[in-house]
């Protein structure tokens, strides 16, 4: 019968060093996390879903105005509330002009969209425009987060069923829990070879329900690619 192993002084020192390094790394990650400086003020109570007008009014008059520097080319409305961005702050405002929740964060805002009754904001960190937060539009409470390596310059890629981004290098979309369902184009750290058949220059991208469409320019010409929004493997387009 073998004698039991005994801990030596060297073992204890090694264990202490490993524990110390682990604690240092965890502490560094905590204190340097981009979301640490975020400040969310939720709604005092859940708001009603204001929905959409059933009949187009015969005339319009301005009820109120809000500054918006999000860079969007059209207003953003979620659950009937107007979502705006100004001075590093996202705000949700009712049709009566009352601001019911705000989300402030010092990081640069890359994109903001809405889907599934949530506001989805994408921020820049030290790994590109890949730090994402979802906020329930009616309550102003956190509804999900994700963080991944992403390009520095991205454009909107969203519908009522999917949200994501597109760039000249790659495109990806996420489902309601912010889990990625499609990854197309250049992959920074490939886990398996030959998963991406066309690493070309993407010129535009759209998504609707269960479809993702991408136009791109390759060495052998220009192409329109249609693929499923929920393939069997998110890393391999179908």
PLM segments and residue spans:
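Well-ordered mid-protein domain cores that form the structural environment of catalytic cofactors
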Residues: 112, 130-147
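N-terminal "mature head" segments of proteins
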Residues: 2-116
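A short beta-strand motif characteristic of beta-propeller blades
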Residues: 54-68, 96-104, 141-147, 180-183, ...
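Short beta-strand elements that form the blades of beta-propeller/WD-repeat-like
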Residues: 73-85, 115-127, 132-133, 155-173, ...
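Repeated scaffold domains used in trafficking and secretory/extracellular systems
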Residues: 63-77, 104-118, 148-161, 190-205, ...
């Amino acid at each position: 019968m073998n004698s039991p192993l005994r801990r030596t002084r060297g073992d204890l020192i090694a264990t202490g060093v490993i524990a110390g390094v682990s604690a240092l790394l965890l502490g560094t990650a905590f204190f340097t996390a981009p979301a640490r400086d975020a400040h969310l003020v939720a709604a005092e109570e859940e708001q009603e879903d204001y929905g959409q007008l059933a009949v187009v009014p015969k005339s319009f008059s301005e009820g109120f105005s809000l500054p918006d520097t999000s860079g969007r080319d059209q207003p953003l409305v979620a659950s009937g509330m107007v979502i705006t961005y100004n001075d590093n702050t996202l705000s949700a405002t009712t049709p009566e002009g009352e601001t019911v929740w705000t989300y402030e964060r010092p990081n640069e805002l890359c994109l903001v969209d809405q889907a599934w009754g949530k506001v989805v904001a994408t921020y820049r960190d030290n790994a590109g425009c890949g730090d994402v937060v979802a906020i329930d539009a009616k309550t102003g409470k956190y509804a999900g987060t994700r963080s991944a390596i992403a390009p520095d310059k991205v454009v909107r890629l969203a519908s009522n069923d999917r949200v994501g981004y597109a760039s000249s290098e790659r495109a990806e979309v996420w489902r309601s829990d912010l889990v990625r369902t499609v990854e197309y184009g250049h992959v920074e750290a490939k886990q398996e070879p030959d998963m991406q058949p066309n690493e070309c220059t993407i010129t535009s991208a759209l998504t609707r329900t269960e479809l993702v469409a991408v136009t791109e320019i390759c060495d052998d010409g220009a192409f329109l690619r249609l693929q499923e929004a929920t393939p069997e493997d998110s890393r391999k387009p179908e």
